[in-house]
């Protein structure tokens, strides 16, 4: 009897940085994440641990940052073995050791988009596309059509804290070029409208800034993956991590002290004032998970029956109360009035 040979398996690895199980389980239980619910029901949930990690040690979080954990996940090396602790480092210790390097060396097609510490782009001949993280040293990537996206992402990362008006023309030019990388016109328009909408709608729209990168990256991923169909593909997204870091207190105020941190005191006179302000951000963690859930649903229709979809988070997070758990020194300007007067800016004050 002749048996039909089963097609080889492919893997699509969604790197959802730092997505916390606490919120995942909560939103699934509330019926808000049907795609994640399907994965939990029909697939497998695996929780790993870092050998030697002791969460009770002072500043234990310093040894489990994303730039440490993701390389361990990619390579199987312990943090001590690969020695990476932050972006900008020489990553030669993991070259040839990452899962995509190994597969590439054996002639199995791969595609990398945004994986942390994946710079520089490299191939032994089987990589179909390779776009490193947005914190890469430069926008090097391949194929050529992916470069427009990487130029915009690297530019955005390099100018994150700079006033938008100073680089608006260059930013808009780079953004428009991302069409070559698969960015949809609707996504480009949404990105261009962000700052004007903030002016109209106020602070409640500001959190979406953290989503824009994922919107663009996902468009490019769908295009590159759809064109090349590599046997192993990865895509890295950071929007959930940002929302958790920034808005956990807004999402679950009952888990935090009814007090003002040193930073809070710069902006609020009373706890009630802070709570009223943060209320407008209470659902952004949920929004970030729900957006990802919709993208997973898209993937289920995009992949074939021989493709395994994996969602990895590298590490979870926990809430730190800024009132007593975060040491964030506040630098105060002394004699500010005299300084601004000398600069001929008498109406200016430090908030």
Regions found by a protein language model. Name each.
Residues 72-268, 272-275:
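His/Asp/Glu-rich, glycine-adjacent segments
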Residues 96, 214-222, 285-300:
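Short, hydrophobic/amphipathic alpha-helical packing segments
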Residues 10-17:
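Short, hydrophobic/glycine-enriched beta-strand segments
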Residues 15, 47-49, 109-115, 232-236, ...:
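A structural signal for short, well-ordered beta-strand segments and their strand-loop junctions
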């Amino acid at each position: 009897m002749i048996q039909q040979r089963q097609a080889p398996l492919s893997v699509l690895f969604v790197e959802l940085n730092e997505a916390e199980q606490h919120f995942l389980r909560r939103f699934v239980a509330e019926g808000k994440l049907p795609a994640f619910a399907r994965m939990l029901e029909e697939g497998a949930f695996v929780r790993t641990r870092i050998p030697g990690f002791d969460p009770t040690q002072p500043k234990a979080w310093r040894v489990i940052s994303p730039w440490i954990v993701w390389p361990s996940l990619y390579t199987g090396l312990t943090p001590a073995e690969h020695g990476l602790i932050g972006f900008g480092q020489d990553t030669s210790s993991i070259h040839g050791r990452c899962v995509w390097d190994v597969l590439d060396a054996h002639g199995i097609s791969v595609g990398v988009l945004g994986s942390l510490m994946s710079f520089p782009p490299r191939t032994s001949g089987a990589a179909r596309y390779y776009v490193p993280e947005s914190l890469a040293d430069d926008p090097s990537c391949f194929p050529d059509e992916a470069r427009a996206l990487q130029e915009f992402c690297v530019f955005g990362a390099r100018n994150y804290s700079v006033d938008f008006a100073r680089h608006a023309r260059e930013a808009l030019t780079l953004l428009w070029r991302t069409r070559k990388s698969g960015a949809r016109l609707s996504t480009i328009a949404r990105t261009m409208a962000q700052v004007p909408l903030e002016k109209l709608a106020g602070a409640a729209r500001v959190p979406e800034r953290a989503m824009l990168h994922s919107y663009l990256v996902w468009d490019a991923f769908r295009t590159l993956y759809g064109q090349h169909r590599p046997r192993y593909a990865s895509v890295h997204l950071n929007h959930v991590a940002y929302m958790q870091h920034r808005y956990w207190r807004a999402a679950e105020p009952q888990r935090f002290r009814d007090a003002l941190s040193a930073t809070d005191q710069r902006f609020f006179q009373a706890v009630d004032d802070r709570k009223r302000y943060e209320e407008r951000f209470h659902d952004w963690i949920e929004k970030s998970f729900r957006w990802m859930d919709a993208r997973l649903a898209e993937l289920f229709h995009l992949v074939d029956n021989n493709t395994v979809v994996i969602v990895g988070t590298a590490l979870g997070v926990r809430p730190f109360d800024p009132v007593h758990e975060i040491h964030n020194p506040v630098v105060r300007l002394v004699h500010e009035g005299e300084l601004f007067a000398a600069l001929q800016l008498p109406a200016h004050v430090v908030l």
